[in-house]
Amino acid sequence: MRKLLAVAVSALALAGAGTAAMWIWPIGAQPPATLASLEGSANRGAYLARMSGCIACHTDGENAGAPLAGGLALETKFGTFFSPNLTMDESEGIGAWSVEDFAKAVRQGVSPEGEPYYPAFPYPFYYKFSDQDIADLWAAFQTVPANPAANEKHELGLPYNMRFGLKAWRTAFLDMSGFETNPEKSDNWNRGKFIVTG
């Protein structure tokens, strides 16, 4: 009986240590220092935002929501996710972010506080964005008027509401490989591949 109890206590201790490790486990790489010096094109960034679904997912059109002010409900088998505010509001939106914060969020799915985003936000597809793509997107988002629409909390049950578990998911499944062109194909072919795969 004592041996069984010792095994149970050891198992609980290991589980607790593993949970604590995942909780404090840092994620995300710092974007290159040269990113901030790139001049972005707001027009090209607006094109990328439309192509990537930013506007469609972050605008609650059915309820007359402001462009990119979030609030769109995304119902899944894991629960309901609500898209966040991406306007330049400094409290509810991304107005207090730096371009480095923006790059980590879009390409790596990591918040400015270092927390992982749920993959309902399709950042695994956006990792292939170049630094110039990010600079252009950032320039476009900076033209969006600030809107104080509050972010709604996701409605998720156990265990999906335990965000720290996403760190294990990222390790197991997240593909962080960049886009590679095929030199044997045309520029248009490679552009099409980029659009389809990321």
Task: Give residue spans per PLM region.
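Electrostatic cytochrome c docking/interface patches
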Residues: I27-R50, A168-V196
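N-terminal type II signal-anchor transmembrane helix
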Residues: R2-Q30
